[in-house]
Amino acid sequence: MTICGVDEAGKGPVLGPMITAGVLVSDMSELEMLGIKDSKKLSPKKRESLFEEITFSWKTYTVVRTPFDIDSREGTMNAFTASCHADVVRALCADFVYLDACDVNAKRFGENVLRLSGSSAHVCSEHKADAKYAVVGAASIVAKVTRDRCIADLKEEYGEIGSGYPSDPATISFLTEYIRTRGEVPLCARRSWQTVQDILDRASQTGLSDFF
């Protein structure tokens, strides 16, 4: 029997892509022996180390959705995320699937993912599955490290952008200054996010020339 876990990183940030990753195993106990856990509970160095071991030892599949993809989506962000999970499930063809549900209704999320994927796999869709099941924890690590590397590339291109989250003052400062000086939204930003709309609204009210 094959088992896959699926999780995403970067659903909420205003900058950078959303990454959805899956890990396919035949025995979850091998992952458990590595001490796999939710990526958020690991140091960056430990995540990187486990990422290398996971991607070397097991089959993985990653879906990258850019800010443009996210802004162009039809429907809710939860539906968009379910479609990304479905892409991973379809690619890995597991007998049993563990999902970290992002919908308030975890069962509904699992049903939607299976329907979109066309898979006949058994599914376990739960909140905080990355902290409960090693295979989802492994997927969480792959997704998080992949996104962290994308953010590092963006920092090389744009300079200091912070973490990319709307709550990060460094991210807000970057967006505000970029829009003030360039008169446009950077390609790394999600235009449909309220954070960007608020900055654009302030810019239009004050005039870009004297904005901030």
Curated annotation (Swiss-Prot):
InterPro entries: RNase_H2_suA, RNase_HII/HIII, RNase_HII/HIII_dom, RNase_HII_arc, RNase_HII_hlx-loop-hlx_cap_dom, RNaseH-like_sf, RNaseH_sf
Cofactor entry: Mn(2+); Mg(2+)
Signal peptide positions (record): none
Assigned EC number: 3.1.26.4
Keywords: Cytoplasm, Endonuclease, Hydrolase, Manganese, Metal-binding, Nuclease
PROSITE patterns, per database record: RNASE_H_2 (PS51975)
Family classification: Belongs to the RNase HII family.
Its biological purpose: Endonuclease that specifically degrades the RNA of RNA-DNA hybrids.
Name of the featured protein: Ribonuclease HII
Gene field: rnhB
